[in-house]
Structure formats: structure tokens, C-alpha cells
């Protein structure tokens, strides 16, 4: 069978769709992947010129798959509608991804089939049924719309417990296309920018109210041995060795497990020993304060870990009462002290969330003060809260009539769109603006562009009281932020994308160094 898989994500780093492709190819199907990578401004849509090229790629397909997130759903709708209108033959279109998994009732309005949950086995069964002209309405994990518009809702099958049974993800770039400057062209090695995003496991045990992982955990409750599943170390090493040999411009791996540091120490030690011996290439990973330990960080750095992202998110009260993270300031500071011991070898980025209408002024101030006492240097990434449908914080906000507009509009914004988030939520704008301006490299004397002395001056009780009641200075600051963001998105990022891979690799090495 000829199958086209389409990713509407903003970057061509989608491991889910590559895994689906690998499963289908292993079964003998002819699969091509199209990365419709586009602007991070989710209000923008594809041009007809681009979609007509997509039609040409899809015209002889027997099955089309579209990957979809809540932020890219409008584009997935546009793609699906255009294909249905322009294709001369009727080709079934299946949607998959996190948003179709959590909201199949919304997605089935546009797609013929919706895949709920892990898609590997379900899509394989679907392709086999279509190829053999068999019914598809009894396949687990699939919602199917028949010719009369009736919807069959099949239950989900258990998670794939043993991840090592999956083939290596599909990086046969000869079969891939990517959108660039309004043209769909063949994928090139240079499009990887010297890096590969990589997952060594699936699942997250935490129930953070802003995250969709909690909904996945509920969906599979009682249907799996464990929510968190890992690839074996030998599988990972064999896979990355294959990719290293395959791509000569590859400079590093970016391990994107929600919390790589969640792995037991014995596994991390085994991974680091074999990675250093056989791969010997720099890598990045993500962690959280509760699972950071001296022993883990020591072996990770020794094996070549040069960057780590740690999620702080909020102050202790916000994490406990609003985000349900169960994380204390003491744990954050303890992790910070461990990480700072390796400051000459390890770049640390802390993620925080702001622009939260459930926080009060004291919560924002406490988070700023926590950042000020964390061991330096580090990089702080300030993200603005997005209410993803179905999450705990979304449901809580939906119950408040005053937050209805915020709930509806914030999911259309990118988390970095600072000016729009602050103006939309209009809660403690002065303090939220200060926190947003602290984004960037942090030393003993400054946070991003903000001198530490200036932050302390701006946080004097008299200044806070005055500026919360008189927002003129805040609006001036927001105008400055808007110009900064516009410059970054319209000028800096396009220029960066046009630079050679060698420059991108060099820039990545120094980007979060202080």
C-alpha cells in the first residue's frame, strides 16, 4: 500500500510519526512522510500553492495520516479539507496524535478515522484491512465514520509495554518531504540542523494540571502494567549508533523524555558507560528537581551531557495547590546546588510558567525570589500558561465565567507570545512583565537584560503597589517586549534558519552558556 503521513508540527522532529512510518515500512508498505513545518504563529495558515503541491504528493496514496496537536488543529483541518476537495479519488484520512487521542469527538468531524492512543498497532491493522478490502470498524483504538456519517467508537488496546519491540524510527530521508519557502521539497540531511530529537521512553507518572499526560494516564488506567515505559539501554545505544553513522553532520542528540532523570540510577549508569564508550557525542536531556541526584548528574556529565532543562514551573505554593506537582522549593534549591558543581561543563536551563490567573502577586514575587537565590550561572526560560483542553487547570478555569475568554483564546497563542498573553489575562501585569523580562542568561548581576539591582528596585512594595494601580509603565514595557518578540520571530529566526549547519551547531553550543 502507498501511505502518506503528514506532520503539521512546527519542526521536523516528530518521533511519533516516524515510528508509525517505521512500523508500516517493516510490514512492506510504501510510506512517505511530509513535514509541513510552518511558522510558530498558529494564526497563520498554508497557502494554496503549498497545499496543491501536497495534493500532488498524495494523489496516488491508498491511505493518508495527519498528526495533530491542539495548537496545529486548525492547520490539520485546512490540510484535510483541501485534500478531500482536490483529490480526484476518495482516499481515507486518519488523524492521530495527542489531540485526537484526548478529543476524538472533535476530530472525527473532519477526519474519516481517528486513532486514539498508541497508534503503531492500530494503524498497522488499518492498513492491512484496507489492503485486503476488509471492514475497519472493529479495529481497537479507532473511531470510524461510515458512509452514513455514523461513528463507531472502538475501545483502546493496552499500551505497548515492551518498547524494544518497536523498530528504529524512520530516518530514511529519501522518502521525506519538507515545506520551505512555500515549496515542498525533498528532505535533506541539513534540515536536521546537526541534531536529532530522541525519546528513550514513554509516559510520565506525574499529574501536573497544565499537562495532557495526566489525561493519557486516565485513558489507560487499568489497561497497562506501567504508565512509564523505557527502551533498554542496548536498544538506545544501537539506535543512536545507527543514526550517528547515517548522518555525518550530526553533532548531538537531544533526549526529549519528559524526565530522563526519572530513570533509576543503575540504568543511567549503564547508559552513560555504554554511551561514552560507543557513541562519544554530546547530548542533552530533561529532568526535574525531585529526581536529580549527585550520582546521576556526575555520570551524565562524564558521558557527554552538556545541557539539561529542569522544570521548576512555579513557587512551592503554586506547584502544590495549582499545578499539583508536589515539588518543594527545598528540592529545587538542592537540585540547583548539585547542578552548579558542574557549571564549567553543564549548561542548565530552568523552565518556569507565568501569566497564571490563579496566582496572586505574592506567588509571582516568590517565584522571582526563588530564581534570585538559585546558584548561578544558568539560563531561565519563561513560558506563559496555555490552557490545553481537558487538562485540570483548563477544567478549573472553565468553571469561572470571568476566565471564559482567557480559556478560549490562550490555546491559540504560543507560550512565548509574551505581550499577547499578558494583555489577554491582565492579572498582576507589572509583576508578570518583570518575570518575562528576566528571561535569558543569568549571572550574579543580571537576569537576561535586567540588572539584579533593577529587579530589586522594581520589587519594592511601594513600586509594586503604584505600578499595579497605574499600569502606564507596564504598557510601555509591553510595547518593548512586543518589538523584541516581533524582531525575534520575523527577523532573527528566519536569518538563523538560513545559516549553514556548522553555524547552527556552534551557536547551539554557546546559546545557553553564561
Predicted regions and their residues:
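Acidic, low-complexity intrinsically disordered segments
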Residues: 1-237, 245
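Conserved acidic residues
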Residues: 62, 112, 251, 306, ...
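Flexible glycine/acidic-rich beta-alpha junction loops that bind and position SAM and/or redox cofactors
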Residues: 40, 103, 206, 219, ...
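Radical SAM enzyme core and accessory elements
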Residues: 2-6, 25-26, 30, 46, ...
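Catalytic cores of alpha/beta
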Residues: 104-109, 296, 357-373
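Hydrophobic/aromatic residues located in beta-strands of well-ordered beta-sheets
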Residues: 3, 93, 139, 253, ...
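Radical SAM [4Fe-4S] cluster-binding motif and immediate context
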Residues: 171-347, 354, 369
Amino acid at each position: 500500500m502507498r501511505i502518506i503521513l503528514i506532520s503539521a508540527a512546527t519542526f521536523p522532529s516528530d518521533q511519533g510519526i516516524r515510528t508509525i512510518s517505521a512500523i508500516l515500512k517493516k510490514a512492506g508498505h510504501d510510506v512517505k512522510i511530509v513535514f509541513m513545518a510552518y511558522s510558530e504563529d498558529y494564526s497563520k495558515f498554508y497557502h494554496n500553492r503549498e497545499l496543491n503541491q501536497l495534493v500532488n504528493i498524495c494523489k496516488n496514496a491508498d491511505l493518508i495520516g495527519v498528526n495533530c496537536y491542539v495548537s496545529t488543529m486548525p492547520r490539520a483541518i485546512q490540510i484535510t479539507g483541501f485534500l478531500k476537495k482536490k483529490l480526484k479519488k476518495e482516499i481515507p484520512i486518519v488523524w492521530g496524535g495527542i489531540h485526537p487521542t484526548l478529543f476524538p469527538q472533535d476530530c472525527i468531524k473532519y477526519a474519516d478515522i481517528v486513532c486514539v492512543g498508541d497508534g503503531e498497532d492500530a494503524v498497522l491493522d488499518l492498513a492491512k484491512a484496507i489492503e485486503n478490502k476488509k471492514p475497519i470498524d472493529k479495529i481497537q483504538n479507532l473511531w470510524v465514520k461510515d458512509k452514513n456519517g455514523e461513528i463507531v467508537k472502538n475501545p483502546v488496546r493496552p499500551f505497548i509495554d515492551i518498547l524494544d519491540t518497536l523498530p528504529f524510527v524512520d530516518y530514511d530521508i529519501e522518502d521525506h518531504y519538507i515545506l520551505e519557502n512555500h515549496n515542498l521539497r525533498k528532505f535533506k540531511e541539513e534540515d536536521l540542523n546537526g541534531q536529532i530529537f530522541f525519546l528513550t521512553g514513554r509516559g510520565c507518572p506525574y499529574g501536573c494540571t497544565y499537562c495532557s499526560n495526566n489525561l493519557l494516564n486516565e485513558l489507560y488506567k487499568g489497561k497497562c502494567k506501567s504508565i512509564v515505559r523505557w527502551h533498554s539501554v542496548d536498544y538506545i545505544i544501537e539506535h543512536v549508533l545507527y543514526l550517528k553513522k547515517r548522518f555525518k553532520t550530526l553533532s548531538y542528540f537531544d533526549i526529549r523524555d519528559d524526565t530522563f532523570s526519572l530513570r533509576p540510577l543503575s540504568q543511567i549508569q549503564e547508559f552513560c558507560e555504554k554511551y561514552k564508550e560507543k557513541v562519544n557525542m554530546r547530548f542533552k536531556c530533561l529532568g526535574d528537581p525531585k529526581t536529580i541526584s549527585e550520582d546521576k548528574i556526575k555520570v551524565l556529565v562524564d558521558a557527554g551531557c552538556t545541557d539539561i532543562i529542569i522544570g521548576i514551573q512555579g513557587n512551592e505554593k503554586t506547584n502544590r495547590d495549582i499545578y499539583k506537582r508536589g515539588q518543594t522549593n527545598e528540592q529545587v534549591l538542592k537540585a540547583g546546588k548539585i547542578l552548579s558543581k558542574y557549571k564549567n561543563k553543564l549548561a542548565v536551563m530552568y523552565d518556569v510558567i507565568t501569566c497564571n490567573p490563579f496566582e496572586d502577586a505574592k506567588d509571582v514575587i516568590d517565584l522571582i525570589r526563588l530564581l534570585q537565590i538559585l546558584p548561578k550561572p544558568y539560563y531561565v526560560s519563561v513560558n506563559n500558561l496555555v490552557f490545553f483542553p481537558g487538562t485540570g487547570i483548563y477544567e478549573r478555569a472553565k468553571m469561572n465565567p470571568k476566565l471564559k475568554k482567557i480559556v478560549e483564546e490562550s490555546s491559540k497563542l504560543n507560550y512565548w507570545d509574551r505581550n499577547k498573553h499578558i494583555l489577554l489575562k491582565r492579572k498582576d501585569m507589572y509583576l508578570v512583565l518583570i518575570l518575562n523580562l528576566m528571561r535569558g542568561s543569568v549571572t550574579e548581576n543580571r537576569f537576561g537584560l535586567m540588572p539584579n539591582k533593577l529587579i530589586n528596585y522594581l520589587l519594592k512594595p511601594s513600586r509594586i503597589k503604584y505600578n499595579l494601580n497605574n499600569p502606564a509603565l507596564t504598557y510601555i514595557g509591553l510595547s518593548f517586549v512586543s518589538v523584541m518578540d516581533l524582531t525575534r520571530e520575523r527577523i532573527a529566526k528566519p536569518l538563523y534558519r538560513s545559516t549553514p549547519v556548522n553555524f547552527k551547531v556552534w551557536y547551539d553550543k554557546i546559546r545557553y552558556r553564561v
